[in-house]
Amino acid sequence: MTIKDWYKLTFLIESDSEEIIIWKLNELGIFSFSFEYLIKNKNKKEVNIWLPVADWSESSRFGVEKIITKLLNINAPTNQFFDWSIIKEEDWLTSWKKYWAPELVGNHFLILPCWINLNEKFKDKKIIKIDPGAAFGTGSHPSTYLCLEKMDNILFSDKKILDIGSGSGILSVAARLLGAKEVCAVDNDYLAINATKSNFQLNFGNLNNLNTYLGSFNEVILKNQLKQFDFVLCNILAEVIKEMIPNIYKCLRNNGEVIFSGILNSQKDEIIKILIQNDLKLLDVSTRKDWACISAQKASDPT
């Protein structure tokens, strides 16, 4: 295995800027990052971002600085705001783990990084064991919270589930824990498909009840004729969701439901409008900080 070096980018933000930073990093395809409270100043957080040296040229790193500076309206010189360092692969493989801890979501879920032992006080929870590796987080993004909270109140027993943009596979695992008989996971990143399989195996000891598809959702739907799902889970960016809604409608059973997350509050009205235009009935909207989760239903065909 080739040993890689990693850039570590560190800077400080106001605590209430965390969500917009997460959104922008996800949009840029950057998933290896953490946020830490400062002991001496609870209104500030330290952001740490890890980027593989081989993939990030000087101009690319400057581009990230420029985007973040504009996003946060920073006037200070970049060399005073951003701190870059290089860490070795072997240090990276252990150092990033210290930023993750077990997290309770909803009434029943506990997200448990696989290297942490389960505390006995949580043994009655539905445990989602996750090994995020270097590419994916452990589910701490507010949009993931919202989706899991919504799922926590739904009966998935014997249902057929489609997870669009599966990422680490956390929603696929949750659906199976809630009793889903079949989970289909779709992602256009082979790392995500591998992570979904790995985390499914980690939780259930096998890949039974899981089917994975590599490619964009619209392409996969047409090629594999995926349809007749009871529930669709879609935790991705709003701009991508808008393009998928017509095909999501087609792959739902009558009375099937879809849960959309990854939507900023400022975008939810537009998404709701498109849902209604595509004959999907709005069921519920929930919010967490700057993010929204929308659930909708495909009505039965008229008889």
UniProtKB/Swiss-Prot annotation:
Keywords: Cytoplasm, Methyltransferase, S-adenosyl-L-methionine, Transferase
Location(s), subcellular: Cytoplasm
One Gene Ontology biological process: methylation
Molecular function GO labels: protein-lysine N-methyltransferase activity
Chief place of localization: cytoplasm
GO cellular component: cytoplasm
Enzyme nomenclature, EC number: 2.1.1.-
Catalytic activity entry: L-lysyl-[protein] + 3 S-adenosyl-L-methionine = N(6),N(6),N(6)-trimethyl-L-lysyl-[protein] + 3 S-adenosyl-L-homocysteine + 3 H(+)
A Pfam family hit: PrmA
Function: Methylates ribosomal protein L11.
Annotated family: Belongs to the methyltransferase superfamily. PrmA family.
Entries under PANTHER family matching the protein: ELECTRON TRANSFER FLAVOPROTEIN BETA SUBUNIT LYSINE METHYLTRANSFERASE (PTHR43648:SF1)
Protein's name according to its UniProt entry: Ribosomal protein L11 methyltransferase
